[in-house]
Amino acid sequence: HINQFIEENNFAAVFTISASILPLPDLSRTGYEEIIKRTDFSLTVAKQHGRNCCYIFQEEEYQNFLRIREITNELHSAVNHDFRGFSIIFQPVMDIRQDKLTGAEVLIRFASKKFGPISPAEFIPLLETSGLIIPTGRWFMREAITACRKIRMQIPDFRVNINVSQVQITKSDVITDLISE
């Protein structure tokens, strides 16, 4: 651990160091700009790990960081362009005693332009951390309720189950939104 307490002119400070180790690849293939980006990433991760920490650059972690950043950018773009890339699907709910369809769980899906279908386990946390879950959740509920109304013309007792994020509950008027739909 590197940590130094300095007191001078009635001013006290403790200094710590966060460092990273970045193996330098062949510059002719990588280029200086990419090395600067990887260095910035490495130092950011070292600081996130806490004081007096050294992070050794891992290519796999960097590629995952780039993937997350790209998916997050695509999510922003989709929300700003009428939710292009999002879709809803229905998971049937059956009453097996009567062998009857009683409803469906409505699920949200997202297809990335670059990566194809993205797992909800990956994109929903990104929606939550970016705050995009609020407008996306509103869109999703509108779509689910509209679809349910159409299905009810054929199956009057049809019901839908909608999953709601904790972020939607704590940071939006999700109940009011549902009632207004």
Regions found by a protein language model. Name each.
Residues 1-11, 38-40, 140-150:
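Alpha-helical scaffold within the catalytic cores of cyclic-nucleotide enzymes
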Residues 2-19, 47, 116, 152-158:
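Catalytic core regions of nucleotide second-messenger enzymes
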Residues 5, 46, 78, 147-151, ...:
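Hydrophobic helix-cap positions at the C-terminus of alpha-helices
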Residues 10-11, 16-35, 60-64, 92-98, ...:
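Catalytic strand-loop-helix junctions within cyclic-nucleotide turnover domains
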Residues 16, 23, 27, 98-105, ...:
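Catalytic core of bacterial c-di-GMP phosphodiesterases, primarily the EAL and HD-GYP domains
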Residues 18-27, 34-49, 55-70, 74, ...:
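Cyclic nucleotide signaling catalytic output domains
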Residues 51-52, 84:
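Flexible, glycine-biased helix-capping/connector loops in cytosolic signal-transduction modules
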Residues 67-126, 163:
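Active-site core of bacterial EAL-family cyclic-dinucleotide phosphodiesterase domains
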